[in-house]
Amino acid sequence: MPREIKDIKDFLIKARRKDAKSVKIKKNPENVKFKVRCSRFLYTLVITDKEKAEKLKQSLPPGLQVKEVK
């Protein structure tokens, strides 16, 4: 089941949960989508600022599998 998250801090909390398996990063010309797969939901965060997206990518937990999709 998909869920959309509007807040970056809320997304980071979801990404640090122990049931979070992986993060997919989808880059489009106008935005960047971060999708974290947890046991029940797929949480999506849409960011239009490229600099914020790079900072968020750096602050993801190190044990999480990160996959970039174009």
Swiss-Prot record:
Disulfide bonds: none annotated. GO terms for molecular function: structural constituent of ribosome. Coiled coil: none annotated. The keyword Ribosomal protein applies. GO terms for cellular component: cytosolic large ribosomal subunit. It comes from the Eukaryota. The keyword Ribosomal protein applies. Keywords: Ribonucleoprotein, Ribosomal protein. Pfam families: Ribosomal_L38e (PF01781). One of its GO terms (biological process) is protein-RNA complex assembly. PANTHER family: 60S RIBOSOMAL PROTEIN L38, LARGE RIBOSOMAL SUBUNIT PROTEIN EL38. Belongs to the eukaryotic ribosomal protein eL38 family. This is Large ribosomal subunit protein eL38.
